[in-house]
Amino acid sequence: MTIRGLETALYVEGLNASEKFYRALFGCKTLLADDRMRAMNIGDTNVLLLFKRGGTTDGEEVEGGFIPPHDATGQIHLCFAIEKDDVEEYQRVLDARNIEIISTVFPPRGGTSLYFRDLEGHLIELATPGICEIY
């Protein structure tokens, strides 16, 4: 059996602002949008789900079944994989958008991780190959 990641979820107050933030930063396309969520294509390998905080606590009937309730509070951490050659470009992009890189880590096994916060305070990491055994 094989398993891989498909979706990453963040819970936000400002759906429109968060959608614009991630589109501007990563150039991702919005796949689905409604009053409670946005689904965005991240690198053709993952879907970033932006849920309106509190908007999914009742679950939802959809064609083909029922999506159970879910929600989260506080700051969440997520990591996106980037190529080593793109680190400086992402540093420039973040700087141009006045997004502070709050930490840069060089793990002992190699690679680089850039950490910053999104509009809602979530901790976002951009990591190059070598940061861990599987990447």
PLM feature segments, named:
Residues 127:
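Short metal-binding segments enriched for Cys and/or His
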Residues 18-23, 94, 121:
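Conserved active-site tyrosine of GNAT-family acetyltransferases
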Residues 1-6, 29-83, 89-117, 130-135:
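Vicinal oxygen chelate
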Residues 118-124:
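Short, contiguous alpha-helical
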